[in-house]
Every structure is written in structure tokens, then in C-alpha cells.
Amino acid sequence: MESLHQAYTYIAQRLNIPGWDDEKVDVKKLVRLYLSKESAGQWLLVFDITDTARLETAGSSQAVSLMEYLPASDQGAIVFTTTERKTAVTLASQNIVELPPEMEQDMAQQMLEMCLISSANKPEVVDLLLKELAYLPLAIVQATAYININKITLTEYLLLLAKKKEEAAEPISTEYENVIGLTWLISFEQIRYQDMVAADYLLFMACIDPRDIPLAVLPMTLSYEKGIDAVGTLNAYSFVTKRTAESALDLHRLVHLSTHKWLKKQELLSQYNQAAITRLLEVFPDDNHWNRSKWRRLLPHAKFALLSGLSRQENNTRIALAHKLAIALFHDGRFDEAETYFDGALQSWKEVLGPEHPSTMSSIGNLALTY
């Protein structure tokens, strides 16, 4: 729900739809109505990685259908990408184009050759590597990035893959997730050896939403240059994609998943989750109207961090972030969601500080505003 809200807000702002900045207006319905009009002209909407046709609201047992927010016009078209067949049928009926996760061998070979700096490779070794990588584009990109940076041969990388496959524990989920997990692990261990700041950045990002991560949210470093170098390292290993115009980063879903699973396996998830919550609290702006674009961008990250982790043990930092999140949602006109977080913060303050504490009383007042 949060990513859809963010995307529709961006669309409404770029199209300058009247009322887009009115906190009492549901921007998702506003965009749907605008694009459904003939006067909107021709348009194309792309929903990338749509895992479900149901939109969950944090703290609520109810969900709404994505279909409620889809515009309808003879001048427009909507494209969904998804790995879930049920979702595809729900959203597109019979208008489905099935694509295998892996590439055709010839195309995969062309991609490998384009990504590699050295072109002097034996065909049989190339074929073997592609087979081990299951012809997956992301696996090919990660593997070639490692090969190029560390100046090793394809055979040496195959040996690394074999070693990590032996060391790996139980399978992650599917074959292609296992392959991505192996290429990720090889690169991540090298990053930890070469650039610990880059490794910390990646572990931090595993505890927030993987899309549109502002560079300003990343943990502080001893110097600006070290931070820039760390982002460069992650980009060189194809772990992140830069959004230059927005000064932000994106993580591929499977990179995010692999990193999150590694944290859990190493029993570090709670530690890094708490660090993410602490950092988000530091950078989350106040509810001033002029800060709206800033805190809107941080909403999905705050939500993810508060729902992530293992124990979810309540502490002042976690509760304070939930309270700030509730205030932001309230000023964004999303009163039901705000109520959920205000109520959660209130119950937590009562438990941690007692019913008469000023923070508890403040939460009671804020909760009353949502009714």
C-alpha cells in the first residue's frame, strides 16, 4: 500500500493534478479519476513486481483490491510484472505473457560477453558457468561484476561457486533464489574484506524498504568520501542501482532477501534492525508542511523497519519512531493508518513509561484527533 501511495503521489505532483497536495484527499483515487478522463491523453502505467492484487494496510486486518485504484481509459494501458500467476490472472485475466525467469542460452551468452572485460574465454567454460548461474540475468550481472573487479578467470569463479554451494545450508526457496544467494554471498564476503562501510550500508538497507533509499538515510561515516566510496563499491558489484536525480538507491528484491536472510542466520537481525530504527528517527523530519515531501519518502522505510526484526522488543526509540510515523500519516490525511500507529505507541508508552508519563498523555491526545 505504501509504495502505491508514494507512486501515485509522485504521478499526481508531476501531472499537477488539482488537489494533489490536499491532505484530506485520497491521492490514489485522484490519479485514477484523472487518468480515466479523455482529457488526460495517452498514458502507460507500469506496476513492477506486483506480488498481490490485495493491498494490506499496516495494523489492519482488512485489505483493499488494487483494482479499486486502476484508471480505465481507451487511451491508456497498464502493464503488470509479477512472479505470482494468481496475481496475474486476477489483474489481467487472459491477457498474460509468460516469461521464464531464465534467459535463452544464446541471449545469456551475449549478456555475459557484454558484461565481461576480458573476452578470451573458452566456449565450454562459458557454457558451464551459464548453466551454474541458471541463465539468470541478475546472477550473470553479479558474477561478471565480481570477475571484473577481482580480475579472476571464469574457472576460478566456478570453483568459488562450487565451494559456496558445499558450504550453503538449506535451500532458500526456488532454484533461481538459490543461485542469486550464492552469487550474492561470494560478492558480499569480498565486500566485507575490502570495504566494511559498504558492507554495513548493505546490512542497514536490508532492514528498510529496498526501493528509493535516500542517500541521506544511510548511516553516518567518518568522512563524506568514505560514504561515496562505499556506495560506489555496492554499485560496482551490482548490488544497488543509483537514482541519480533523486540521490537514492534501489536494491533488487533478491539481493534484499539474501542480505536479510544472512542477518537472521548470523543472529544480527535485531542489532541492525535497531540501528535502522535509530537512524530513521534521527533523520525523520518534524510535521511541518514544508517537510512533507521528505517524510513522505521515509514512510515506507519507517514502516518496514518497525515491522522487521525478530523480537520487536519495545523501547523508547522504536516507540518514538512509531509516534513520528503516526503524526506524518495524520498530516497526510491517512487517519486510519495514523490511528493504528498512535494506538500502538500509546500502549507501548503505557507499558514502558506508565500511564501518567507526559509521552503517554501526548499519545492519548494524538489518538483522539483521529476519531
Protein language model regions, located:
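Residue register of alpha-helical TPR repeats
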Residues: 320, 359-362, 369
